From Swiss-Prot:
Listed PROSITE patterns: RIBOSOMAL_S9 (PS00360)
Name assigned to this protein: Small ribosomal subunit protein uS9
GO biological process: translation
Lineage top rank: taxon: Bacteria
GO MF annotation list: RNA binding; structural constituent of ribosome
Xref: PANTHER family: RIBOSOMAL PROTEIN S9 (PTHR21569), SMALL RIBOSOMAL SUBUNIT PROTEIN US9M (PTHR21569:SF1)
One Gene Ontology cellular component annotation held by this UniProt entry: cytosolic small ribosomal subunit
Amino acid sequence: MAKVYATGKRKTAIAKVWLTSGSGKLNINGQSLNDWLGGHEAIKMKVMQPLILTKQEKSVDIHAVTLGGGYSAQAEALRHGISKALNAYDVAFRAMLKPKGLLTRDSRVVERKKYGKRKARRSPQFSKR
């Protein structure tokens, strides 16, 4: 199978993912998953979720580049990108990924600040007298 490309997004983070058939190597920003995320086990599981769900953790290689956002948002963007790449790799995986919500882009982003307010919704202190 040829290389499959997909992008995943979450908040301001973007993950560009290339998926090829191989032996289960993950290369994220030139590092392995353990080097990239260190001791964040819950976030590592989040990244591996689509691979474990489709039982492809030992049969595909993933090369990814992440931009913007923090570690958690980048990891969720990576999960979204891997899910989209697996869907393009084999359409049969869609039935496993779609019910878990892994192909859906999480559209929640930071609410903008409004004028006359201190933050998006926080008002200045009100004094009656």
